[in-house]
């Protein structure tokens, strides 16, 4: 099999069917395409523009070739909070901190993420600074999700076939379809998600894709300021996915009873700065950093069915932080990893 026929169709601005997209991704993941071919494929796809069918096909191939992580929750909801990364906004690790808040509120979390590729500090970088090794064996990660309430799915460890495309991504230093696919390919089978998208168009595509892929409930969000999170600087476009249906919504800071923030209030920095911010939020410090973590945790709790409304989710998040439970989840995961 060759990637070239699929590449030529993209060059001619023809869309791939879901089946053809799946076949093309299988070629990439099996190492049957050169780096030059992969780079050309990614750029041609980016210039043409991705479709829902293409995302569905790519995601199916990646899911099928991922290392399985099976927490065996016996019907309990499993949530992922994952952005596409690389939004260029320079914020701190909002979805990662929110994941621990959600776990402390009683929802099992399978946090899917990676090291920084196009930003200064990825979710994996922050976790390691907390003493949490990110590349635990799948069995250990599954146990952590089940018993600690949260586990980290390190993309290179669970998507080992991505090693064939990783050097290309690093060299290109561009956001590609793989940024969109990360949140669509959780190998633990998350049934609820809060997904951050890099644009309103990408959010709509990703929502259509996860609906087609069978997600029970979730939100795909894009802030008006460009954040791949629910922002607190203004409105956020949200696509709510529920049992195959997609509903377009606009979320405002007032929906969560938080003050409107200035963009500079949400800035992070390098690993040291992001660690400082994350620690201060989990220690209970008030301010815009806390607000945006709570807002995203609240939406995640609604997606998981733990809260019926965003305000209920906010209340659960406040308790999780101010009781020390969220910070305790960080320590519990670090202690669990150290004991393995």
Curated annotation (Swiss-Prot):
Cofactor descriptive note: Binds 2 magnesium ions per monomer.
Q: Which residues bind Mg(2+) 2?
A: 228-229
What pathway does the UniProt record associate with this protein? Amino-acid biosynthesis; L-tryptophan biosynthesis; L-tryptophan from chorismate: step 2/5
Residue positions annotated to bind anthranilate 1 are: 83, 114
Q: Where does 5-phospho-alpha-D-ribose 1-diphosphate bind?
A: 83, 86-87, 91, 93-96, 111-119, 123
Keywords from UniProt, A to Z, are:
Amino-acid biosynthesis, Aromatic amino acid biosynthesis, Glycosyltransferase, Magnesium, Metal-binding, Transferase, Tryptophan biosynthesis
Task: Determine the domain of life of the protein's source.
Answer: Bacteria
Could you say which enzyme class this protein belongs to?
Answer: transferase
Catalysed reactions listed for this entry: N-(5-phospho-beta-D-ribosyl)anthranilate + diphosphate = 5-phospho-alpha-D-ribose 1-diphosphate + anthranilate
**Where does this protein hold anthranilate 2?**
169
Give me the segments passing through the membrane: none
| GO MF, one example | magnesium ion binding
Q: What is its EC number?
A: 2.4.2.18
**Assembly mode:** Homodimer.
Output the HAMAP family linked to this UniProt entry.
Answer: TrpD
Protein name stated in the entry? Anthranilate phosphoribosyltransferase
**What species was this sequence derived from?**
Solibacter usitatus (strain Ellin6076)
